[in-house]
Amino acid sequence: MEDARSYMVSTAPAAEGLFGLLNNYGWRKMRALVDITKSRSREELDTHKEHFSSTDVAREVIAGSILQIAYIAIERYAVPKGKSENARHFESEINRLIRESSKARLKGTFSLPEQFCVGRDIGHLPMGMIVYAGRNQYNHFAEDRLRVLNEVVFNHLHNIWPTPRNGLSFNLYDGKHFHSYSVLAALGWTDSAKELGYLAYKRDLSDVLQIEC
């Protein structure tokens, strides 16, 4: 029977490989840009531009796959310790806004799923909730709108980082884009310069699963 430790061990090769691909992203992007500058015809330029854009899509797919692995780990094996003071305050503020707005999409009580209220706080939300919303945005990209809970998490991230650099964004309403890599950045899992993203990922998940890896 699989437990938290065996899940982490069995998914480690995939997770580490995905982080390795992310670590190479910067070089791939730079090479794609150089190819654009060296284009000798309109046809070559169009091809190189397409390749340049595809590297961004690849980055989002890789990041989304990492979020999926983390999501399953938390959903199945995280050990909740109760909602933090920040999480409870966040819930109360959202419920206040719902009561004060006749146009609120959510008519009932807003509540964060306790299974994902785990890990260190990022702003006023626990790490598990950031994984939750990031994974759902990636997996339900084709839908017109996300559920309220997911949108609220992204709005919170957008309030913390309204104008992040390097092509990152948490704004769900500015065109149709994946935000998987931006979520990894918010989690602190993107240090490709020193290749520390995987170690940060493993440390955070080991903490919420209460295991040593």
Predicted features and spans:
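Short secondary-structure subsegments characteristic of cysteine-rich extracellular domains
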Residues: 156-165
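Histidine-centered, metal-coordinating catalytic motifs and their short helical/loop contexts
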Residues: 122-150
